[in-house]
């Protein structure tokens, strides 16, 4: 049977508004398989970002305990779909059943670990919003002062996952981001179009207990230009050159800098040089064959951590 993947935006499976589709292929055999990928363009890509930017409360509003319950449910659903994941990973990645099964099991455990953190992030197992760090400090008047910090969600997290480990290298970004109360927009590799169908089902489980748009899943983008300043973080796996390519193919242009930390100068958002935000590519290696690294682009200049 012909499998057709769609976009997952605002809790709804939708076809591309511009009607673009591309054939899926079996990477292992380099032949076409029975499926078509619904491609997304700029208007669809911007939709989840526009809706979520600055509205983190829609995820936080679910509450830490509810986020924990949802993430545990996602893990169970994921493992129940193991045979389907194995089948699709064999077609698209050429993975053996043993390797694909391991990835599903490990990915489910990532969500379980993330679930265990959901009620701890704000400093209490009961999930109340209390200061997470506090210390007393002497003051000249002798009364003393209490300093404390409160953890808050970053905002919208854009996740770009690679073709070779499409599940594991996606879940260990998505799980912690949701546990911390962020909203997430996922863009799998264009090669993993059929694999995305299984991802969508997990997204629907998460969104079932959250406000509309907590998770969005897009397909292939002709241009990675859905990035916007103001709290957006893009997390991807690969060498620094991958981040540079994405930056060059988006609304951001590269300026000079060393190989390990590159400044990205946004175009079209800043009228004056002093208004430019300064996102960075962090912890990336430009040398190939050095294992998996993570490139994290923080659009508001803050330092965001990711795994890859």
UniProtKB/Swiss-Prot annotation:
GO terms for molecular function: oxidoreductase activity. SUPFAM superfamilies: ALDH-like. This is Limonin dehydrogenase. Optimum pH is 8.5. It is found in: Periplasm. Optimum temperature is 35 degrees Celsius. Catalyzes the NAD(+)-dependent conversion of limonin. Completely inhibited by HgCl(2), CoCl(2) and CaCl(2). Its EC number is 1.2.1.-.
